[in-house]
A protein has these predicted regions:
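Ser/Thr-glycine-rich phosphate-binding loops at phosphate-binding pockets of nucleotides
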Residues: 38, 45-47, 124-134
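RNA pseudouridine synthases
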Residues: 1-105, 111-114, 158
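Hydrophobic residues embedded in beta-strands of well-ordered beta-sheets
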Residues: 93-94, 118, 173
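Short histidine-centered loop motifs in beta-beta connectors
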Residues: 115-123
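Beta-strand scaffold of nucleotide-dependent catalytic cores
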Residues: 82-84, 120, 133
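A structural micro-motif recognizing beta-strand termini
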Residues: 72, 122-125
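Pseudouridine synthases involved in rRNA/tRNA modification
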Residues: 102, 129-176
Length: 176
């Protein structure tokens, strides 16, 4: 849920992970995080065997994530791939760069488009901090409601992790 941290900290507020552990047991672990304001799917492992197996898939980039976002502006349908470098800027915020930082690649598909807003699917090929937000900004279509580009009256931003696709270890199946 939006506003709930995936992982808590000692003596801090409750987290999604602590709530799942109450239901599924103390060994349950979140395999990734979402920003506090991002909604969507969170993948958990119920025991150490699955935690190791799924963590290995994340490390080997075998897990594909699909995000949906509502962005401000009419997305140019010719923009289906954004490849930049991402680094901390002098002001301490994350930003796109032509030469500094780590390589970041996202492919996009327009799901719906109007004059003021567009609905896009984002498939990150790398996992950099704020990658999709920054790539939407690079396309000239910031995600609605995000930080310094907040829309008047927007109380949240419109960005969700919609799906995962990955092979299921030990079973020889695919999930997603």
């Amino acid at each position: 849920p939006r506003g709930l941290l995936v992982e808590g900290f000692e003596g801090g507020e409750s987290s999604l992970e602590s709530l799942v552990r109450e239901y599924a047991g103390e060994r349950a672990r979140a395999l990734h995080r979402l920003d506090r304001d991002t909604t969507g799917v969170v993948l958990f492992a119920k025991n150490s065997k699955w935690n190791r197996a799924l963590a290995e898939l994340f490390e080997k980039k075998r897990i594909r994530k699909e995000y949906w976002a509502i962005v401000r502006g009419s997305w140019d349908k010719r923009i289906n791939r954004i490849d930049t470098r991402i680094c901390r800027q002098e002001n301490g915020r994350w930003g796109n760069s032509k030469s500094d930082g780590k390589a970041a690649l996202t492919t996009f598909r327009v799901l719906g488009r109007g004059e003021e807003f567009s609905w896009v699917q984002a498939l990150p090929k790398t996992g950099r901090t704020h990658q999709i937000r920054l790539h939407c900004l690079a396309a000239g279509c910031p995600i609605v409601g995000i930080g310094f580009i907040r829309m008047t009256g927007a109380t949240r931003f419109f960005y969700t992790l919609k799906a995962f696709r990955f092979p299921i270890p030990m079973a020889g199946l695919k999930f997603g």
